[in-house]
């Protein structure tokens, strides 16, 4: 049973924008201001975060055009390096990164809902779980209704942000920005990490490639257009915050969008910010709920997860059991309250994988420029790898010629710079909070022995069948 292609360019752009724009942009600017306490420093951090995100998106766009397969980043890592590299990404996704982020955003949604309908801690947690399970149910019954909800929520949130900008930048509301402190290198990187957290999720559209029409062209376009929209929106919002509020209030604020709206349009208008955050959070959850199970589906297809995780619903044509598993685990993280600890310790490790994607793209480009071996050498190499795969029972990579329909700009300087900044961020995180950072890294690396055990236990695939699966045939 195959997945169905129901996602077009509009839905794909909505997925990029909707997944990135969650609740962070209404909170993170204050975090950035405390790391770089000046107008110029904040502007520099947000421009750097936007540029870095855009470069990362362009790298993913190139890879998606070369490997338009369900699984996205998992497939890219598998093709570049090994199935083990892809497995580690999926392992970290399920246990912490994606499931934990779903739980964290769901709690933001529930806390803001509690400002409209008062409820206690248990009520907030149950509301968060209800949001997760409700959106999981919508995606369970089809990618078409799931992407329709995602598109509707994205259009609503962008329209609401447009209204917010009009309110904030109205006549008579502006203050001259004043610097409050010096910028340091560690502070800049702390601010960059906070800013990039608000840009997280740009890669998730690649996970549903086999449900996207003309995926090798649609996904790159969606990534470039969607990321550009978010960068512009974020720069405008941050500029508005800084021009509306005195800098000392920016530093002290914990709900900067609410405070800025209250200062310009009064408390009544500010209360509408809660509704905006609710809609924005639901849109982000919806995109992640749609995307994540496609990775687990791809891993199960490769024999690296339970076979049932790769099951496709006979009527709805969705990886329904993977959606259920993700929804249950995210709900457990909400109810136990462990999501915050896990996400804060593990989320930075995704930049190790993103750096690997950038460097891997350079390697793929260089190999594709080299003269091809003659047919006899290629056949001999393919036979040897097939024999090795049968001995080790590991899934084969497709080894298709690297011929992307889209190429990232600025090669090779941009990918190298992107990878360097990713590694600097990781080093800064380990130096700043060594115990937590190493704990998170350990959770990711713990997937290696699991992969070793799993790869021995999985059934041996016929080499032609495995190659066809890897190639998406």
Name each model-derived stretch.
Residues 1-30, 34-39, 53-58, 70, ...:
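Membrane-interface "cap" regions at the ends of multi-pass membrane proteins
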Residues 1-4, 39-43, 120-123, 151-275, ...:
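Helix-loop-helix junctions that connect adjacent transmembrane segments
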Residues 31-34, 44, 53-132, 136-140, ...:
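Hydrophobic transmembrane alpha-helices that form the core helical bundles
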Residues 74-79, 106-127, 209-216, 221-229, ...:
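Helix-loop-helix connectors at the membrane interface of multi-pass transporters/channels
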Residues 123-171, 182-183, 223-224, 346-357, ...:
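Membrane-interface loop-to-helix entry segments
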Residues 349, 410-473:
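A generic transmembrane alpha-helix motif of multi-pass inner-membrane proteins
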């Amino acid at each position: 049973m195959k997945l169905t292609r129901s996602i077009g360019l509009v839905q794909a752009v909505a997925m990029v924008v909707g997944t990135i724009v969650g609740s962070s942009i209404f909170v993170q600017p204050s975090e950035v201001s405390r790391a770089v306490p000046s107008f110029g420093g904040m502007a520099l951090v947000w421009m750097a975060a936007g540029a870095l995100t855009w470069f990362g998106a362009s790298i993913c766009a190139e890879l998606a055009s070369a490997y338009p397969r369900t699984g996205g980043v998992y497939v890219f890592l598998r093709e570049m390096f090994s199935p083990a590299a892809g497995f580690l990404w999926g392992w970290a996704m399920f246990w912490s990164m994606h499931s934990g982020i779903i739980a964290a955003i769901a709690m933001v949604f529930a806390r803001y809902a509690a400002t409209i309908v008062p409820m206690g801690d248990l009520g907030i947690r149950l509301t968060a779980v209800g949001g997760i399970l409700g959106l999981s149910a919508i995606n369970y019954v089809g990618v078409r209704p799931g992407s329709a909800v995602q598109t509707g929520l994205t259009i609503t949130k962008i329209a609401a942000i447009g209204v917010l900008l009009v309110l904030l930048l109205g006549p008579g509301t502006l203050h001259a920005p004043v610097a409050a402190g010096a910028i340091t290198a560690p502070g800049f990187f702390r601010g960059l990490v906070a800013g990039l957290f608000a840009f997280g999720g740009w890669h998730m559209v690649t996970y549903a490639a086999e449900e996207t029409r003309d995926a090798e062209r649609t996904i790159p376009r969606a990534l470039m257009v969607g990321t550009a929209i978010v960068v512009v929106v974020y720069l405008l919002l941050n500029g508005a915050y800084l021009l509306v509020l005195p800098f000392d209030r920016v530093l002290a604020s914990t709900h900067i969008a609410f405070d800025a709206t209250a200062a310009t349009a009064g408390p009544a208008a500010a209360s509408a910010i809660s509704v905006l955050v609710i809609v924005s959070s639901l849109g982000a959850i919806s995109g992640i709920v749609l995307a994540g199970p496609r990775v687990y589906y791809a891993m199960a297809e490769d024999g690296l997860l339970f076979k049932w995780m790769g099951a496709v619903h006979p009527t709805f044509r969705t990886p329904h059991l993977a959606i259920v598993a993700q929804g249950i685990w995210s709900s457990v993280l909400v109810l136990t309250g462990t999501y915050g600890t896990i996400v804060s310790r593990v989320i930075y490790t995704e930049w190790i994988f993103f750096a690997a994607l950038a460097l891997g793209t350079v390697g793929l480009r260089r190999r594709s420029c080299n003269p091809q071996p003659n047919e006899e050498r290629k056949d001999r190499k393919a036979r040897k790898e097939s024999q090795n795969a049968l001995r080790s029972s590991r899934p084969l990579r497709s080894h298709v010629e690297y011929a992307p329909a889209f190429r990232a700009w600025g090669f090779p300087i941009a990918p190298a710079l992107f990878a360097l900044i990713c590694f600097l961020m990781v080093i800064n995180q380990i130096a700043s909070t060594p115990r937590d950072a190493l704990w998170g890294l350990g959770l990711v690396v713990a997937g290696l022995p699991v992969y070793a055990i799993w790869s021995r236990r999985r059934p041996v695939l016929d080499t032609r069948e495995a190659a066809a699966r890897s190639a998406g045939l």
